[in-house]
Amino acid sequence: MEAPEVPVGSLIDFETEPPTSPPLEAAPSTLQDPDGSLGDGASESETTESADSENDMGESPSHPSWDQDRRSSSNESFSSNQSADSAPDEETLALREFMRSYVEKIFSGGEDLDQEEKAKFGEYCSGEDGKGREWFARFVSAQRCKSKCVSEPTFYRLVQSFAVVLFECHQMDDFGPAKNLMTMCFTYYHLGKPQLPPTEPREKPAGSIDSYLKSANSWLAEKKDIAERLLKNTENMKGFFGGLETKLKGPLVRKNEEDENKPKDRQTKTVTMISPEDEQKGEKVYLYTHLRQQPIWHTLRFWNAAFFDAVHCERRKRSPTTRGDAGEQEEKREKWCHMTQEERDDSLRFNENITFGQLGTFTHNMLAFGLNKKLCSDFLKKQAVIGNLDEEQYKLLSDHIEQMATE
């Protein structure tokens, strides 16, 4: 594929023109809060978490560089770029403090949320300015620095709160908080009881993110269990060491012992065994398994807008020309005409790798949310052309979609 000498963002069709946002002003230090600032929290998996999970929330809301970056990309992203960082007033401070307290109660797992708090939460999340949705997404993302594994009560509180916010995001076409909550859907989990029907074979796919690891652990546990039973069971132990006593008995006794051993052999082939550690830990149940029916996931406009924003933020975060010395030199290096041929090749390769990684993440998430294979393939084809991926990269992603669709 020939590399187009135009920015990626100008080719993406959002189907509706995003409203222009007024210039943003950095909030005073009164809005500064440790919970609003996120560190480089590691993702659960490179294949399950978008690489831009730290994009909008990697810095404090009042940080100058955050405000500058948001200002420069406000017309290139989507409508959710209306920031919660406007001039502080009593209403803004009250909203922010409420969302902080609300999220803390969700993750504490102790104090219950009363009906008044739930009603106020719904009111804030339905605001047209999107501040309530944005602050909720930020505070939820900040909690992952503490722990990604949550208790069962916290898990279902998150499911209910996510459902409210995602519905309002769909109604308002507010794709920013929805994109960040999409990442959180593959981050937070609780440990459920492993479901192991005795009649199903071990080879049946587990249908979860950790299916490959669990199948390997199950195989090892099965072999360990067989060895333990050989040592504990008297008859098996005699057979294991040569069956000396069996040879002294008559053919009838030997026949009875063979009949007893046959069902046991069949059982070891059909029952999935798990290690004691897995029994204690249980199976990871992620938020996305309970939020597949949210209408925003089935809107292609969301995926186009979210993908563009993810690629844009990843380039801005990783590019050595945008995170080093600012000023005229940066502007010159950003212009294609001022780049050497080697710099152009490196820039193209750099952008292709980012697009490839984000497409792998997004197509995985789309399939996990229940989108059909054709829709995912069409999305991949469109973005691969825009991102100038080569045939090998495109084939790898296509094969990944086929593999996940069959599973």
Curated annotation (Swiss-Prot):
| Residues that bear Phosphoserine | S275
Q: Does the keyword Oxidoreductase apply?
A: no
Matching Pfam families? SBF2
Signal sequence coordinates: none
- Entry keywords, A to Z: Phosphoprotein
Compositional bias (Low complexity): 74-86
The Acidic residues compositionally biased stretches are: 46-57
Establish whether keyword Phosphoprotein is in the entry: yes
Q: Which domain of life is it from?
A: Eukaryota
In residue numbers, the region (Disordered) covers 1-90
InterPro entries in the record: KIAA0513, SBF1/SBF2
Q: Which PANTHER family match?
A: SIMILAR TO RIKEN CDNA 6430548M08 (PTHR13663:SF2)
Its recorded name reads: Uncharacterized protein KIAA0513
Which species is this record about? Mus musculus (Mouse)
